[in-house]
Amino acid sequence: MQSEQIYIFNPEHDLCIANGDENFVPPRSAMGFAEENIDLSEHLKRPNKQRRQIIPWGWNHSLKKRLANEGIDPATLPSEEELQFIRTHSRREFALDVHSRLSCRDSQVIGPDYRIVATSVSEIEDFISANDSAVLKSPLSGSGKGIRFVREKLSESDEGWCRRTLDKQGSVIVERRFEIMKECAMLFEC
């Protein structure tokens, strides 16, 4: 019996994975686009005449719970270990590690000290002080909510954001700010 593939466009995935709680409810703004373009419940309520392979934009605890509540057999959904693997490998630190292994020429262009993985506010402040400006990135984030641009020093708001991010996610990626020439993004299916 051939399996039916159900693709789920869940653009709120990054916010859900950053939050980590299966009961997290993303902001309405993050959900609107997906809701305008697909009615998931209609696909899931059809008689189960064939096996279904669910292929989301990204797996997270919120989606797993939502699908289980819609009647999908929990045995066909990712395990806790698989979800933790996805969360760990979705962190910016993982991408930085992979990047450092793939590109030896970049260190000649941008220098080995253009970014740090900070675990304290004082590390962040020292980096900004040494570089005049910086981009602060939370290890897990989505929809641009985990990126802040800072010039000269942390504002009260920036410092509060750093403390909350350090408390919840354990680190903040701090990079020298460069002039943006072009922005692009890619999506891979593995």
Locate each region found by the language model.
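Conserved glycosyltransferase catalytic-site signature
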Residues: 35-38, 145, 180-183
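Generic beta-sheet signal
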Residues: 5-7, 52-54, 134-136, 172
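Glycine-rich phosphate-binding loop of ATP-grasp-fold ATP-dependent ligases
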Residues: 113-116, 133-161, 183-185
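Phosphate-binding site of ATP-dependent enzymes
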Residues: 132, 157-190
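A short acidic (Asp/Glu
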Residues: 16-24, 64-70, 145-148, 184-185
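N-terminal-proximal low-complexity accessory segments that begin disordered
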Residues: 2-39
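Short, surface-exposed loop and linker segments with low hydrophobicity and enrichment for Pro/Ser/Thr
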Residues: 1-5, 46-53, 129, 163-167
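Conserved N-proximal alpha/beta basic substrate-recognition cap immediately N-terminal to
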Residues: 11, 29-130, 142
